[in-house]
C-alpha cells in the first residue's frame, strides 16, 4: 500500500511539474505577444499628426481607432496636394459622447 501511495505522489508531482512548464511557455508566448503589440502601439501615428504616407497607421483612441482623414490643399502656385491627418470621425465622436454621458449618469 505504501508503494502505491509513493507512486501516486510521484505521478501527481510529475503531472503538476509538466503542467507548470506548459503554463510558463504560454506565459512567455503571451508576454512576447504583448511586447509586439506595445511596439506597434509606439509606431502608430498619434491624433492630429500627418498620415499622408501611412493611411492605416493611426493609433487607437479611447474607444475607436483614429481614421486618416484627407483634404486637398491648393498652394499659392495653384498646385493641388493631398494632406492627411489622424482624427476622430464625427460618428465616433458622437458615440464617445453618448458613452461618456452614460457613464456620468449610471457610473
Curated annotation (Swiss-Prot):
PROSITE patterns: SPIDER_CSTX
Propiece residues: 21-41
Disulfide bond among keywords: yes
Expression sites by tissue: Expressed by the venom gland.
Keyword list, A-Z: Disulfide bond, Knottin, Secreted, Signal, Toxin
Top-level taxon: Eukaryota
InterPro entries: Spider_toxin_CSTX_knottin (IPR019553), Spider_toxin_CSTX_Knottin_CS (IPR011142)
Cysteine disulfide partners in this protein: 44-59, 51-68, 58-86, 70-84
Annotated signal sequence range: 1-20
Subcellular location: Secreted
Family from the record: Belongs to the neurotoxin 19 (CSTX) family. 04 (U1-Lctx) subfamily.
A single cellular component GO annotation: extracellular region
Annotated GO MF terms: toxin activity
Keyword Signal: yes
Cited Pfam families: Toxin_35
Protein name, as recorded: U1-lycotoxin-Ls1q
UniProt free text on domains: The presence of a 'disulfide through disulfide knot' structurally defines this protein as a knottin.
Amino acid at each position: 500500500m505504501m508503494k502505491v501511495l509513493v507512486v501516486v505522489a510521484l505521478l501527481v508531482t510529475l503531472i503538476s511539474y509538466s503542467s507548470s512548464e506548459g503554463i510558463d511557455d504560454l506565459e512567455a508566448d503571451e508576454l512576447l505577444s504583448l511586447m509586439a503589440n506595445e511596439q506597434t502601439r509606439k509606431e502608430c501615428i498619434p491624433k492630429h499628426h500627418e498620415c499622408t504616407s501611412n493611411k492605416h497607421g493611426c493609433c487607437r483612441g479611447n474607444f475607436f481607432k483614429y481614421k486618416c482623414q484627407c483634404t486637398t490643399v491648393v498652394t499659392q502656385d495653384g498646385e493641388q496636394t493631398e494632406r492627411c491627418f489622424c482624427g476622430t470621425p464625427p460618428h465616433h465622436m458622437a458615440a464617445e459622447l453618448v458613452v461618456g454621458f452614460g457613464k456620468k449618469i449610471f457610473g
